[in-house]
């Protein structure tokens, strides 16, 4: 695997020198300063590429080129936003950057309720608490019909939880959910959030798939033409939330994408932490079935709790993800490609490390502190080395 590291640009508290010292050779980044929907110019792409290369690294993957909400709702200026996206892909290819991670999650990108969940060893992790999320949705957001998405027990627990929250607790929970986590390109006030949800009131799973198909049929031929590999990121968490449909959550969703636009430019990001939240997702089977189309991997693990919809970020080699079998399947896919004369490694980045050690004293991007990811990268690197030596050494 190509060892990469997500970097949020010049304002990231983790420097490119840190990235290189961590042992990564590739950088995963994006032009976050460009508004959603606008074209990434060749000039801006080359500026960022030069910064990365001057540090002795390579810009391996774009994460992400965000998709404008008009495209997802098939309203407004969506045709222009699609044309802009096509041009951005052409410009990236012209600059030699050919792997693009993206997602089709409506309104919200990845979502957590607690950004400082304290683990038994004193380190901090990200957590999604189903009951706190229900309390937010029913008692703070007050979304009409929200009760239909929860069990009677969850509704009762959410009411109790909300009653014990201080004003500060409510503000923090609201901020965690709607203000935008690292990599998310949209942040909202509560009123803005309600208005954006309203835009989806008539969009169910079938309709969102229809809108996604319009996007894929416009974008994938351009990607194929210029040699760019599109790698869709799964929903996080991988299930409907806030009354919004989610359409990249299961192996059936992956098959739908391939059936909709059967091009090798139409591929996947294997995010083990996102897919792995669902107990019914067999990650190794997903890799084996869609291996030739996996162009990027996020390796992390989550741990489901007593309520199976509640989870926290586990250490990379612990939790519900069998990281050994996952890495073995990825390495096997790389060797399959090599046998076909393809030498390209699959970029991998350690995802969502714990905040630990000296980073506990620093202001960090939630999930993206240096030391936790350094630990995760070292652990995954060790797993891969053992697999390569045991099964593929000559």
From Swiss-Prot:
The keyword Iron applies. Its cofactor is Fe(2+); Mn(2+). Keywords: Iron, Lyase, Manganese. One of its GO terms (molecular function) is manganese ion binding. It is an enzyme of class 4 (lyase). Pathway: Carbohydrate metabolism; pentose and glucuronate interconversion. It catalyses: D-mannonate = 2-dehydro-3-deoxy-D-gluconate + H2O. Signal peptide: none annotated. InterPro entries: Man_deHydtase, Xyl_isomerase-like_sf. Catalyzes the dehydration of D-mannonate. PANTHER family: MANNONATE DEHYDRATASE (PTHR30387:SF2). HAMAP family: UxuA. Belongs to the mannonate dehydratase family. This is Mannonate dehydratase. It comes from Escherichia coli (strain 55989 / EAEC). The lineage of its organism: Bacteria, Pseudomonadati, Pseudomonadota, Gammaproteobacteria, Enterobacterales.
